[in-house]
């Protein structure tokens, strides 16, 4: 990238901060709250443009606010309190996100993913499903879906899951039937398989709390704004009917709307069998990994009254180290995990400050006045639809969640009649499901889009069709099922 095009990415967040800070102070807001919001908005712009990695953007924002805390973070009344030391208080705020249980849950889930990858268990599971179900193209679509479904609960990076585990396997399948990329033969079987790869990644990202990092970011934002939260089991149970429906419906729907020319064949099962033979029998490390994952899932679903989900993850990671499934170097060298750890903790810190300075409360009251007179159900559905469609304007799920989720939560808090747990779960599901809309919405999207099997027109058309179906089903289950199990 040329320096001339690089500098605007650095200057744009600073310009946004300056413009907002110089605007007239809105009625009902204190000056420090407005200045805090200016810096927060600048951070969001930085996350979208990424002049530097997202974690660095967030850390710079926190540093600015902490250093200038007498003017950005604390009110004159707080500063006037006897014994109030803004230096200690600002430091305490700056690192508060790193003690959030959500951060440690997602870090543990990353280590689970490392265990899957290092032992080869994730690849083995996918190959077994392909071998057993690959004789018919439709069943091969279900094999892709089930592979994603099994890996999703313990792989919080949908990019690692979709682009790092599933894609390297399924990209080998079309050439077995002479279905080549960027060629008329791509529709033979390759286009269907690749579309199933990305759509399965989006669906499974919405099914489990730990299937996608922005899901956990949303819960952190929800907790910082309201002290309410959703457990792993709450999320799973609330999504259960929609999850079952989508897992069973999507492969068939893709088969109907984007039909492969080739309907059956034996080449894929034979290839998968060859790969499994090369891997050898299930080894002891894979068995230990499988046992720990089953135990973690059971505790996440049923153990919420006895042990926190983050503590389950923390303990399982300790056992993985003791059982030599992973080693300490695997933890300290996991760049993806530490990257998410820092940006997620930093964003939760920033969201907490947005609430502490009173901005969320002020914005909620502002919305309450404009939304009064409308049915809470209509407002909730309208907010979900707007949130969902705004995905077209974001190329990062993290930036999308960071920018819009606090506003969505504030809007829900403005109307006490809106059930916050239900609304937040619908928002969370929309993050994953809405990732299907564009070829840039989430990490694996460009990988599948660039495979040569999904022409631009087809991707946008299918994204709109599947996106609309997902949205309708989400609203229906959100109104009929989720209140029954979450309230």
UniProtKB/Swiss-Prot annotation:
It comes from the Bacteria. It catalyses: (2R,3R)-tartrate(out) + succinate(in) = (2R,3R)-tartrate(in) + succinate(out). InterPro entries: CitT-rel, SLC13A/DASS. The keyword Phosphoprotein does not apply. Its main location: membrane. It holds the Pfam family Na_sulph_symp. Keywords: Antiport, Cell inner membrane, Cell membrane, Membrane, Transmembrane, Transmembrane helix, Transport. It is found in: Cell inner membrane. It is a multi-pass membrane protein. The chain crosses the membrane at residues 10-30, 33-53, 54-74, 93-113, 137-157, 189-209, 236-256, 292-312, 313-333, 340-360, 370-390, 393-413, 418-438, 462-482. One of its GO terms (molecular function) is antiporter activity. One of its GO terms (cellular component) is plasma membrane. PANTHER family: DICARBOXYLATE TRANSPORTER 2.1, CHLOROPLASTIC. Belongs to the SLC13A/DASS transporter (TC 2.A.47) family. DIT1 subfamily. Catalyzes the uptake of tartrate in exchange for intracellular succinate. Essential for anaerobic L-tartrate fermentation. This is L-tartrate/succinate antiporter.
């Amino acid at each position: 990238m040329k320096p001339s095009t690089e500098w605007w990415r650095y200057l744009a967040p600073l310009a946004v901060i300056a413009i907002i800070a110089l605007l007239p102070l809105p009625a009902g807001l204190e000056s420090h709250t407005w200045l805090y919001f200016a810096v927060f908005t600048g951070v969001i712009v930085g996350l979208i443009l990424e002049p530097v990695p997202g974690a660095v953007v967030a850390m710079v924002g926190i540093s600015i606010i902490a250093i200038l805390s007498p003017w950005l973070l604390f009110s004159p009344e707080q500063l006037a309190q006897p014994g109030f030391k803004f230096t200690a208080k600002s430091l305490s705020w700056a690192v508060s996100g790193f003690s959030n249980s959500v951060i440690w849950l997602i870090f543990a889930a990353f280590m689970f993913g490392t265990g899957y990858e290092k032992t080869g268990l994730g690849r083995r599971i996918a190959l077994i499903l392909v071998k057993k179900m690959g004789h018919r193209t439709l069943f091969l679509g279900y094999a892709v879906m089930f592979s994603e479904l099994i890996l999703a609960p313990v792989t919080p990076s949908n990019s690692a899951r979709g682009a790092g585990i599933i894609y390297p396997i399924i990209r080998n399948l079309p050439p077995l039937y002479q279905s080549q990329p960027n060629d008329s033969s791509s529709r033979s079987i390759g286009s269907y398989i690749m579309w199933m790869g990305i759509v399965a990644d989006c669906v499974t990202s919405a099914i489990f709390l730990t299937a996608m990092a922005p899901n956990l970011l949303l819960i952190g934002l929800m907790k910082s704004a309201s002290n309410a939260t959703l457990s792993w089991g709450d999320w799973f149970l609330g999504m259960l009917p929609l999850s079952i429906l989508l897992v069973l419906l999507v492969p068939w729907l893709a088969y109907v709307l984007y039909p492969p020319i080739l309907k059956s064949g034996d080449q894929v099962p034979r290839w998968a069998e060859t790969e499994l033979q090369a891997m050898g029998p299930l080894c002891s490390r894979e068995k230990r990994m499988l046992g720990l994952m089953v135990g973690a899932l059971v505790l996440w679903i049923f153990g919420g009254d006895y042990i926190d989900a983050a503590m389950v993850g923390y303990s399982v990671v300790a056992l993985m180290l003791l059982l030599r499934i992973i080693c300490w170097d695997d933890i300290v060298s996991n760049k993806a995990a530490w990257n998410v750890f820092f940006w997620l903790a930093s964003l939760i810190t920033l969201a907490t400050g947005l609430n502490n300075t009173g901005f969320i409360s002020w914005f909620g009251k502002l919305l309450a006045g404009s939304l009064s007179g409308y049915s809470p159900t209509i407002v909730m559905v309208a907010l979900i639809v707007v949130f969902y469609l705004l995905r077209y304007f974001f190329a990062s799920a993290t930036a999308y969640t960071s920018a819009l989720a606090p506003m969505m939560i504030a809007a829900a808090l403005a109307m006490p009649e809106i059930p916050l747990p239900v609304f937040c779960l619908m928002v969370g599901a929309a993050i994953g499901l809405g990732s299907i809309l564009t070829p840039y919405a989430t990490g694996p999207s460009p990988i599948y889009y660039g495979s040569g099997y999904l022409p631009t027109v087809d991707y946008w058309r299918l994204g709109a069709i599947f996106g609309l179906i997902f949205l309708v089903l989400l609203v229906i289950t959100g109104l009929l099922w989720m209140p029954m199990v979450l309230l």
